[in-house]
Amino acid sequence: DVYKRQHFGNVECREGDDKSVFITALDHMVEFEDGKAPVQFLMTSCMDFDGKTVDDFTRSQMWDCQESRDRILEECRYSMLATDFLARGLSSLERANLEMDYLEALAELFPSCEAFFFSGSGKLFEAEEIRGNQIEGPDRFIRYAVNVRFFTIQGSDDMLVDTLGMNTLFLPDLQYHFRGLDPNWIVNHAYNVASYLLTSGNEIDSGETIDGIKDGDMDRSIQWKCQYEDALIQPKRPVLDINTGEYAAGNRE
């Protein structure tokens, strides 16, 4: 009932043989060459969970719940998988909104849920943050499903910021290899650019420029060149590398 009233409109639900639940969102159709079909969502039955399966690399980039991260991963004993089917055929914007509607529905449906983990980006949130969300529209996806990661390069002053999770929507992840800039400025810049790519529907091509940073804010008087490259940090994927001008580090083709 919570799905129908608040989140998906018209739905059909059925239970699988293994107690999984399939939810068909009848108001969200995907068109194919030979017809069309509604988007579906899956909730698996409860499974045992062992926090030790989350590696140190992934843990190191869980910036949104650093104080509670270890407690959650140590104390949680059960998990369930929630995902979508056929949603790849939707526009990036519609899929982002629909997935976040699903997230909010899950937070309501399972009041005893402690946390949400986004396997596509490595983000971990306490469930209460989802329940208290004040963000509307597609920026919910940027907040919860896109991880802006930060790395220092051993043996140098170089730093690297990248995003992980935009590729879920078939949009480019971002990458910045730089030195001499406040990394928090770059993190904010990355979230702003990611939001622009999702909400505007515009593409950024290799060789084009975007507004850079001055005193922590985006500034049109400074232009940073963009180009597509292979990611420097796992997982392997193409990224839109943003050259920070005089603060750029590393070699670019």
Spans of model-derived segments:
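Short, intrinsically disordered low-complexity segments
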Residues: 7-70
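Low-complexity, flexible helical/coil segments
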Residues: 18-27, 114-121, 152-154
